[in-house]
Amino acid sequence: MKKISIYLIATGIISLSSITAHSQSKFEKILKKVTTKTGSTSTTKGSSTATGTPTTSEMGFGIKEALEIGISRGTDLLSAKDGFLGNAAVKILFPPEAQKVERTLRSIGMGSLADNVILSLNRAAEDAAKEAKPIFVSAIKQMTITDVTNILLGQQDAATNYFKRVTTSQLMEKFQPVITTSLNKVGAAKYWGDAAGQYNKIPLVKPVSTDLSSYVAQKAIDGMFIQVAQEELKIRGSLGARSTPLLQKVFGYADQKK
């Protein structure tokens, strides 16, 4: 009888140990699942903060990155063949005071001469546009935190206005000699001289004398800023133009503030 009792007690202990081990194993599995789930939740929360408020440093890098992308794209477009000539928004035509020259030439069957003048003006601007990128990049590097904040949270053309303020005089200084050389290279001075000469021969007309170099330089600069403004609008308004996570974060923040 005593032996039977000992046997039953031993069997009970073994069974209890088995149950306890099984329960512990099951508990560990549940704990593991909870821990994993909690970890993934934390990770998700952590990643969501990446789309929150950017730091001052991130805003600076983001704006500069966006503008460098836009400036590079814009200057490459305008400096290519037909960059000015093939773009109605920036195409350079006869100076306002000389448009009567163009009309007269076309009316007397000399339209090809007028076309040559327009072609040469735009080729000169395309040559000059190659000089613009370093000037714009330098202006981007000089931006202060105040400039960056004003651009990020400012009007749709805030960056374009910044460039106008900072780079116009440098662009004119750089463009004018390039355009003068280019006008001579493409024969613009000759075409213009021929066109103005033919017009000035017409009785009773007021002779025209336009400084082509200054005119084309100013129109080329105007065209640069038109293109820059278009690139700025793309970055601000098109999610596809925000090509990096940093740009998405910075401009996403700007969207929320407006």
Name the predicted role of every residue range:
Residues 26-118:
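N-terminal Sec/ER secretory leader and immediately downstream segment
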Residues 19-23:
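Sec/Tat signal peptide C-region and signal peptidase I cleavage site
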Residues 178-223:
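An amphipathic alpha-helical core segment
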Residues 1-8:
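Bacterial N-terminal signal peptides that target proteins for export
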Residues 110-182:
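Mid-length scaffold segments of soluble, non-membrane domains
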Residues 9-17:
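Bacterial N-terminal signal peptides
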Residues 26-39, 213, 220-258:
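A cross-kingdom marker for long, charged
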